[in-house]
Regions:
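Glycine-rich phosphate-binding P-loop
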Residues: 1-12
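Conserved nucleotide-binding/hydrolysis micro-motifs of P-loop NTPases
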Residues: 3, 45, 66-72, 121-123
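Short, well-ordered alpha-helix to beta-strand connector turns
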Residues: 13, 35, 111-112
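Glycine-rich phosphate-binding loop used to anchor ATP phosphates in small-molecule kinases
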Residues: 19-65, 100
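Amphipathic alpha-helical transducer elements in NTP-driven molecular machines
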Residues: 21-25, 47, 70-71, 87-90, ...
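A contiguous binding-surface segment within folded domains or other stable secondary-structure elements
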Residues: 53-83
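Conserved GTP-binding G-domain of TRAFAC-class P-loop NTPases and closely related GTPase folds
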Residues: 79-166
């Protein structure tokens, strides 16, 4: 909550994926069964869904968005609420922030592509931090935010040492 997932979807994905399926497995299954493309917005990536989708012939791409601090997300949610948007208690926003990165390192082994974005500087837009393809790091930003370093730290640091960072 407050990282910018819905804003990203509205700006960049809605045209290609007009159906945003809730993160409820029962509502996702018909899309898998009918082999229809869809997008899911959730705070935690369902690796089982990724595996099922790949087994059904889908190409899977995870776009993960976070910020440096849960309190930044709380502030954004408060602004959204003041404008009539969806309400959420600060404790829920903080819990969601913590929960969101718990399985992120594992996700890269389940998704065909994992693109990690930092949206801390709201006025500068989304910044690609890392791009994993087939579980392997393809590119990493020159500057890694602390939250991403905690998740992928050694791997991103090693990539820089090998001269693998790209223009992201």
């Amino acid at each position: 909550m407050g990282a910018g997932k819905t804003t990203f979807y509205e700006a960049y994905l809605k045209e290609a994926f007009p159906t945003l399926v809730p993160a409820v497995r029962e509502q996702q299954q018909p899309f898998l069964n009918d082999r229809r493309s869809f997008a899911v917005e959730d705070i935690r990536v369902d690796t089982q869904l990724l595996d099922e989708a790949k087994a059904a012939g889908y190409s899977t791409k995870v776009l993960f968005i976070s910020t440096e601090d849960a309190n930044l997300n709380v502030g954004r949610v408060l602004v959204r609420m003041s404008r009539g948007g969806q309400a959420a208690p600060a404790s829920s926003v903080i819990d969601s922030y913590r929960e969101s990165t718990k399985n992120l390192s594992e996700v890269r082994r389940h998704a065909d592509d994992l693109i990690v974005y930092d949206n801390t500087a709201h006025d500068r837009g989304y910044r690609v931090v890392a791009h994993f393809t087939g579980g392997e790091l393809g590119k990493a930003a020159q500057t890694i935010p602390d939250w991403a370093a905690k998740v992928f730290g050694k791997e991103l640091h090693s990539a820089k040492q090998r001269g693998k960072p790209g223009r992201t």
